[in-house]
Amino acid sequence: MKTNLAVFFGGRSVEHDVSIVTGLQAIEHVDKEKYDVIPVYLARDGAWYTGQALLDVALFQDFEAQKQKVRQVRLSTVPGEGLLTDDGNIQVDVALLCMHGLHGEDGALQGLLELA
């Protein structure tokens, strides 16, 4: 059984765009034999999204017009529930934080994930 690896990128910081590049590059180099990758994009407005469409960098040129291609998610506050969607939950075993700047490099997201 593969490990579910959530890769977090984007965010509200001024380094939002470079975080997208970092996240996509990290995903590209993950060993897909060992991990099922769950891309998790944090939009500029703070909403969280997941879906395979996030793997295409072109999606981010006009995300607002394209966001119907992905699902909005939120982090459960119940330990072990992972990410919640309108149609169930997504189990997360490991998180890779590829966010730069505010809420990424300051440990805020890490702290939030540790509480979940």
Identify the function of each model-found stretch.
Residues M1-A116:
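ATP-binding N-terminal substructure of ATP-dependent carboxylate-amine bond-forming enzymes
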